[in-house]
């Protein structure tokens, strides 16, 4: 994903083995089939290409202190649960059971492209999140008011 960015929203079903098909439009943004999955902040999963994860986790580790309780919480919730997986020949992403449980992934999933990473949501949980986060979205757009569009 060096030059290309992840974008779009894609509905896919998790198969009985815990695998999720990676959409063709997202595959072109990958330069490597190794991906790192971890718990995200809003009860979903983040998916990073391996090189992007290395940069992201290094930045977190460089700023975190084991003597600072909030830093330990970030390390425990973002770094510790991270697992590397390799896409199979059919471009399926295996989601380990512990991560499926964290994000409540059973069947109906949504894959979101967030430019530098992907999010994987349970579809119903994402709809609920959208309803709950409208005020945050509006506040966030106000921080972008200096953009020239």
Swiss-Prot record:
The residue ranges of the SpoVT-AbrB domain are 9-52, 82-125
Please give the SUPFAM superfamilies that the UniProt record associates with this protein. Answer: AbrB/MazE/MraZ-like (SSF89447)
Fetch the CDD domains from UniProt.
MraZ_C, MraZ_N
State the superkingdom. Bacteria
Pfam families tied to this protein: MraZ (PF02381)
Primary residence: cytoplasm
Q: Which GO terms describe its cellular component?
A: cytoplasm; nucleoid
- Write one Gene Ontology MF term: DNA-binding transcription factor activity
Q: What UniProt keywords are attached to this protein's entry?
A: Cytoplasm, DNA-binding, Repeat, Transcription, Transcription regulation
Q: How does it assemble?
A: Forms oligomers.
Q: What is this protein called?
A: Transcriptional regulator MraZ
Q: Which gene encodes it?
A: mraZ
